């Protein structure tokens, strides 16, 4: 429980006098709603707080624009697009009426806005429109790009500039400001007659919108407590008072009282005591004073180095108060070690936007992968018409894209999110002539980015480091002299994969159509400098020095077999050489495997289908969330030491205890926005992903009919043997008695980057988009034996 005793005040008389002036708690920063024009148009309150109500571009977006939506050479449809007054969403007209939620998209879900013919769709289908009139809105997750053409270049620019301003303001918002923004957008929607007054019926509608099923009698009592005019309508300050009551955080108030005592403000020394109890390493009085200056809202309190409840809540909702160590969100690891010492974010079938049977191939898939920090992408290369190689999933109905278009996308987008090296994993099915074309395109398009020879002064027995290869692109491919099969043929890349899969999947042997044998062109072979592709059939050490520049490829099944039968040998192999693991060919729907199993053995290039959401991609996102999301994460020391004895199947006795007290959640999303009476019954599951003996999951009870501020106060405890490898996945589900629970949100974090104490967990959707302001509030304790 959160209950705790009072603390005696240790302040001077002057501090006590000031504390009495500033102690009154607020739920928000003071609202200007009752004293300005936003009272007349309450929906504009959000834009006013963003400082954008007078912006000409935003004003034009509020009025709306008729833009052409472009899908093909013949499909050009005019649609009305209009920014909503909440500043968070854009409404658009549809030819076929659908549910209201299907007529909007949210600014926070936008990945990028590109001008001109920068998207694949506009390059192919936008020739009839001037580039200056065109723009592309690219979304996070699986939502398709929106390719648009405006009547004039100026109107296109207004949307490009306006969306950029809105995204920048949204990114700069604190969690508390997002909450304020969020609740007022629902308030505007609940005000059915738009008279800036709220009847009890409208208040009940608001409560259902924000996922609260409140007893009518209790809701009416709250309503009447705020109805100071006694006219059965709330307006202005009365509405703000109601929202303050609604958004109270009793559990935070209890923690605050423990440290602040009777006068309800924290001095710098009391805040320092809280930080020390939190386990903040190196916390000092100066740190506490700086936090007060950063997060306190009351200027009088700030001047006297005091923190009110509002400032305390602002701090706990900030990145500094979150569960993820904010120091780990930038590049903090040693980037000067050999490539084999890092986990490297890797994609399989990167070109696909859907399944590998009939999905679409697109350069946009590469752009999205790079935006997510991916550093190793796959190019499945086949003979194309007109002497130009194409990329697609061979012998299927997937569409085809030109090899050169993909290389241009690599050139333009490989280093937008990370400066560290990119590996192009070539699956080569082309003849000698088109292989030579591939080599020419790689050299001419990538230029100096492409690594074409070994680095000067580099130890030939060791791979270079990410730091040495900043801004460079490596080719993973076959190197002459090529490996030969038992009958002496030179194998194609796909045959190698098939040979391994046939060993494990003999039932498919008759159905497999084997690629014809092909040689490797000298031009393409010369580009495989540090990533020479080879089959990894055995872990027996070969005579002579280690072949550090070879990359062993193997299926998920073969990797599991190595881990089970020769765990330590596999780990040692991966201390010096790169290993790429790919999904079995049986996964026709582009499903993923559990990457944690491969990371446990030190495999660096664990390739997943980035286009397929699920817990596997959640783990991948969590693994690479740290170190600036640069796509490289340093492996634990026992996965880097040449003579390591670590075996993921036998990791030794437990040496760490993790205790997570799940306290509350805030503002969970509705699962069915079109059904007001649909309220979630949330439960929280905490999953541990690590070596097999560490894997576990435990969950709380469910809370009936409350997605707004459910409370659990339940502790879940885990004993861990290899904590450095552990990922902790927090999952919120809607409990269902008759069918599987429905997913609400999740967050996956590396244990090594978790901070102890009272922390907020910021939840993500199934596609990885932010669900702000939805959070979990937990207490974390990590004890090492």
From Swiss-Prot:
Among SUPFAM superfamilies, the record links this protein to:
C2 domain (Calcium/lipid-binding domain, CaLB), EF-hand, PH domain-like, PLC-like phosphodiesterases
Q: Which residues bind Ca(2+) 4?
A: 679, 681, 705
Chain spans, region Substrate binding? 69-97
The entry's free-text remark on the cofactor is: Binds 5 Ca(2+) ions per subunit. Two of the Ca(2+) ions are bound to the C2 domain.
> Subcellular location, in the record's words?
Membrane; Cytoplasm; Cleavage furrow
What does the entry list as the binding residues for Ca(2+) 5?
734-736
Instruction: Enumerate the residues binding Ca(2+) 1.
Output: 191, 193, 195, 197, 202
Binding residues for substrate, per the UniProt record? 476, 478, 553, 580
**Enzyme Commission numbers on file:** 3.1.4.11
Q: Which reaction does it catalyse?
A: a 1,2-diacyl-sn-glycero-3-phospho-(1D-myo-inositol-4,5-bisphosphate) + H2O = 1D-myo-inositol 1,4,5-trisphosphate + a 1,2-diacyl-sn-glycerol + H(+)
State where Ca(2+) 3 binds. 349, 378, 380, 427
Matching entries from CDD domains are given as: C2_PLC_like (cd00275), EFh_PI-PLCdelta3 (cd16218), PH_PLC_delta (cd13363), PI-PLCc_delta3 (cd08630)
Active site positions, chain numbering: 348, 393
Activity control summary: Strongly activated by phosphatidic acid. Inhibited by phosphatidylethanolamine (PtdEtn), phosphatidylcholine (PtdCho), sphingomyelin and phosphatidylserine (PtdSer).
- State a single Gene Ontology molecular function: phosphatidylinositol-4,5-bisphosphate phospholipase C activity
Here the segments flagged for biased composition (Acidic residues) are 494-509
- EF-hand domain: which residues? 178-213, 214-249, 246-281
Record remark on domains: The C2 domain is a Ca(2+)-dependent membrane-targeting module. The PH domain mediates interaction with the surface membrane by binding to PIP2.
**What does the UniProt record say this protein does?**
Hydrolyzes the phosphatidylinositol 4,5-bisphosphate (PIP2) to generate 2 second messenger molecules diacylglycerol (DAG) and inositol 1,4,5-trisphosphate (IP3). DAG mediates the activation of protein kinase C (PKC), while IP3 releases Ca(2+) from intracellular stores. Essential for trophoblast and placental development. May participate in cytokinesis by hydrolyzing PIP2 at the cleavage furrow. Regulates neurite outgrowth through the inhibition of RhoA/Rho kinase signaling.
Q: What is the official name of this protein in its record? A: 1-phosphatidylinositol 4,5-bisphosphate phosphodiesterase delta-3
State the species of origin. Mus musculus (Mouse)
Q: What would be the name of the gene that encodes this protein? A: Plcd3
